[in-house]
């Protein structure tokens, strides 16, 4: 799930801040929300000397939005001593400059269905902390080694519109189902 990937990217950054792709995904993700590539990402990533990391460019930026992002990222680096569950919990409960917690940012960007997989990730982190030595790098390695897929029960009724493929909706029931004809050409007068 994309919310889980966003949380794992925060852990990856804390372990290796020089990983430019991970950092770019965090910038565009729900925690920072800098989705305008032309304004944020291209000037930071494209206009840099060879060998200069994206993290270095972010720290040197004078753009107020990038400075706020740098502050959030520095906060992640200050938490590297925490166990994985404590790290994730502190990020999700932290109130940002915009007045929203990490949970609220995930919900606003990805919707309420994103909460279950993120909670499952945090449960995995708590289990990992009790069995293995609590380290961010160890938890990341365990998650990547097991490649576990966290799914949500979609059969539970909710008051929301779900856009799904026919295969994904197989076996589900709803009072209204819309099946658009995506293969026919435009009809005259419509």
Spans of model-derived segments:
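Conserved helicase C-terminal RecA-like lobe
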Residues: 1, 5-190
């Amino acid at each position: 799930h994309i919310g889980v990937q966003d949380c794992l990217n925060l852990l990856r950054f804390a372990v290796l801040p020089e990983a430019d792709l991970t950092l770019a995904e965090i910038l565009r993700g729900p925690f920072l929300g800098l989705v305008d590539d032309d304004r944020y990402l291209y000037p930071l990533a494209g206009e840099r000397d060879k060998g200069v990391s994206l993290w270095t460019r972010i720290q040197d930026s004078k753009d107020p939005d990038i400075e706020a992002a740098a502050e959030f990222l520095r906060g992640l680096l200050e938490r590297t001593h925490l166990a994985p569950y404590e790290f994730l919990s502190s990020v999700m409960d932290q109130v940002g400059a915009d007045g929203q917690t990490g949970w609220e940012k995930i919900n606003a960007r990805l919707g309420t269905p994103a909460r279950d997989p993120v909670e499952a990730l945090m449960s995995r982190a708590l289990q990992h902390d009790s069995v293995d030595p609590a380290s961010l790098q160890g938890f990341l390695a365990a998650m990547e080694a097991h490649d576990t897929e966290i799914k949500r029960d979609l059969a539970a009724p909710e008051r929301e519109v779900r856009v799904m493929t026919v295969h994904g909706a197989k076996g589900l029931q709803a009072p209204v189902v819309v099946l658009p004809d995506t293969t026919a050409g435009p009809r005259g007068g419509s």
